[in-house]
Amino acid sequence: MAPSHARPTQPVLSCRDVEKLYGTRDNVTRALDGVSFDVAAGEYVAIMGPSGSGKTTLLNCISTIDRPTSGHIYVDGQDITALRPGQLSKFRRERLGFVFQDSNLLDTLTARENIALALTINHAPAKEVVARVTGVAQRLGVTDVLDKFPHEMSGGQKQRVAAARAIVTD
């Protein structure tokens, strides 16, 4: 077999020497200590460890909820640790979606309205909102609950609606 000369693809996520310190000079907690890894497109990753090992801190840094003390985090080659506040807001708005363990759906909105929320906030045209919400609802199998409120849905339905809300802007 001939050797492959295909160019390796860039990781979708890359962490390089990420450190996070909390506390004061006299009482420092090192939550992350030189974390480095890559995630390729289509790859599934589990972050595992005992309580207090830094899993949530790492996810908070990757998701831009928190900033690392040092090191770099790249999303599709873009160093998100170097973004200024305005750039970071734009990055969050256009590139990130969150699905929390508790679905965090707004109780006063239907599933359809919850899914459409980011598009509505960003003033997307009404036809685009309808098309995107319908498309993502079909892909995630939640078309039957679009007009229901969160208290009328099962836990699994809420999670799928939350996932739809997270990816509707893609």
Residues covered by each model-derived region:
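Pre-NBD coupling/linker segments of ABC/ABC-like ATPases
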Residues: 1-9
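ABC family nucleotide-binding domain
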Residues: 10-170
